[in-house]
Amino acid sequence: VCSSDLCVDPDWEPFEILDKNGKHVGIAADIIRLISSKLEIEIKIIPTKTWEESIEFSKEERCDLMSFLNETPQRKEWLTFTEPIFKDPNVIIGRLDSPIIKDLSKIKASIAIPKGTAMYERFQKDFPKLIIIPVNSEDEAFKLVEEKKADLTVRSMIISAFNIKEKGFFNLKILNQPENYENHLRIGVIKDEPVLKDILNKAIVTLTKEEIQNIINRWVAIKYEKVEDY
């Protein structure tokens, strides 16, 4: 059995967190366990305090793998990516009294986005009129909108549904689902391990819609779309 070191997002509930005992739990954790059981690869978690620290560890090759992330031009500088495991739309979140947003490029507003995320990278480039407020966690992004310190946040549908329901952000709502901003979540593999990427892909293409939906259902009630572009 070969083993690989994995860096994760320690604060991305319900996708993944490191719990108080340092255990990797959540949707991504369960899917990665399923992949590792299909391949007989032992995956060891390298603990970090933040997603940004995980990115630094990955760049320093202190971990071979990065859990559940979008492929972006910046990340491709040091990572190669598996096939997408699943896609999850991003949604714009505002307060109950916020107007529906038809076109993000036409508005001036402040938007809270966690640092080091794909949306942080893309929104800076795509929407120069938006004032981006960098935050350290999902929770902080939702709180800033709730406390009127930011007008909006953009987060994954699964994250948003979970936070609004489970964490009681009941004065927040989904305002829009911007086109072409889905999360195509993959595993990132450091560039000098191309064989490892090929091995992971062998298991990823065998994952069924039912297997993934069953895992998602353990954490949140939401319908999942499988990416059919392998």
List PLM regions with ranges.
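A ligand-binding cleft/hinge motif common to bilobed small-molecule-binding domains
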Residues: E52, E56-K59, F68-W78, K125, ...
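Alpha-helical transmembrane signal-anchor helices
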Residues: E228-Y230
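Extracytoplasmic small-molecule ligand-binding "clamshell" domains
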Residues: S4-E77, I113, I131-E138, K143, ...
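Short acidic, glycine/proline-rich loop/turn micro-motifs
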Residues: E16-N21, L104-S105, K125
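Short beta-strand->loop
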Residues: L79-K87, V91, I131-I133, F169-Y181, ...
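Conserved functional loop/turn residues at catalytic and ligand-binding sites
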Residues: R62, K149, E211
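Extended ligand-binding regions for polar small-molecule ligands
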Residues: G26-K38, L96-Y120, Q124, I158-A161, ...
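Hydrophobic/proline-rich hinge and linker segments of small-molecule sensing/allosteric domains
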Residues: D5-P10, T80-K102, K115, I187-K191
